[in-house]
């Protein structure tokens, strides 16, 4: 970045507060935020006249008010297509780790310094994955990649999406489309949340909808925390009305609800610090995307990954 541009970097990689972000926006021609940097309408209103591009280091742009940026003549870009496989891998990791109690078992060995009582018929019993019904909420690139992996593990694939996928994809995955999200939730053993975070998907998995799930079912979320009513999810797990959850994202991250931490200690949930895309290869690909978008913009071309307000 420094070789190509007069770049001012967040050297210690700390999470910038709002005054720091606004100060950068007043001086910069191009801003490169991460998904935890909130670029809301108030911040955009205070941007300097030279700021013309916000090149987000991330696929999701729910941290940016894209409409407000457009009104100020500021282009927004993201880094699509490079995180699909990494995020799908993490989804499968959570999908396996919760029913099979993998983290609980690993923690037990660590706490006992490798000592355990030995095998017995009822030792660390979890739930079988093979043959279970997986309901995918959001059958885009990531949802489809999750489905391909899950099919190889013997799960039957079901999905809810704004639009039905092609007959070829349905045939390949032997996938069943559900027009009604409510009806799908009530029939699945595992729900995987893979849709984008938009105003329309805020609390898409509401208290009412989560309550439709079977008490033996699990929820997995590697998309965005705001899509699920987190408090409702916690209450149902606490009450034994839902078997558990695997979460890589949280409604108020980076803060994690203390009640979720308590459930994790009991082995009811597996919690990860939003690391679904955290691979060396993925980060390099994201950085390359950011630079390609900046160079195109600086050279007077339309950036290839421009985000339009009506697409958010």
Where are these regions (language model features)?
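Hydrophobic/small residue at the entry helix of a nucleotide-binding pocket
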Residues: 142
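Rossmann-like adenosine-cofactor binding region
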Residues: 39-42, 163-261
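Conserved beta-strand positions in the Rossmann-like core of class I SAM-dependent methyltransferases
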Residues: 8, 158, 226
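Phosphate-binding beta-alpha-beta segment of Rossmann-like dinucleotide-binding domains, i.e.
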Residues: 80-133, 145-148, 159, 167, ...
């Amino acid at each position: 970045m420094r070789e190509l541009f007069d770049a001012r970097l967040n050297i210690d990689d700390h999470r910038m507060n709002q005054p720091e972000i606004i100060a950068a926006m007043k001086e910069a021609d191009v801003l490169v935020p991460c998904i935890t940097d909130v670029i809301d309408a108030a911040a955009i209103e205070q941007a300097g006249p030279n700021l013309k591009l916000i090149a987000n280091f991330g696929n999701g742009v729910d941290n940016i008010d894209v409409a407000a940026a457009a009104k100020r003549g500021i282009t927004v870009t993201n880094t699509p297509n490079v995180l699909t496989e990494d995020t799908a891998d993490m989804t499968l990791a959570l999908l396996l780790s919760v029913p099979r109690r993998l983290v609980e078992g690993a923690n037990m060995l660590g706490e006992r310094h490798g000592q355990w009582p030995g095998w017995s018929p009822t030792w660390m019993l979890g739930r079988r994955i093979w043959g279970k019904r997986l309901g995918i909420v959001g059958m885009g690139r990531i949802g489809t990649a999750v489905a391909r992996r899950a099919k190889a593990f013997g799960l039957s694939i079901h999905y809810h999406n704004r639009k039905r996928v092609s007959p070829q994809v349905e045939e390949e995955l032997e996938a069943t489309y559900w027009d009604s999200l409510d009806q799908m939730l009530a029939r699945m053993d595992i729900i995987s949340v893979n849709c984008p975070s938009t105003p329309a998907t805020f609390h898409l998995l509401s208290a009412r909808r989560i309550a439709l799930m079977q008490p033996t079912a699990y929820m997995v979320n590697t998309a965005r925390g705001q899509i699920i009513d987190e408090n409702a999810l916690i209450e149902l797990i606490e009450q034994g009305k839902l078997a558990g959850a695997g979460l890589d994202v949280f409604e108020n991250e980076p803060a994690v609800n203390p009640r979720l931490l308590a459930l994790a200690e009991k082995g009811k949930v597996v919690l990860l610090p939003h690391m679904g895309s955290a691979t060396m290869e993925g980060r390099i690909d994201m950085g390359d995307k950011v630079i390609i978008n900046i160079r195109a913009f600086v050279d007077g071309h339309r950036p290839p990954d421009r985000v339009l307000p009506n697409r958010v």
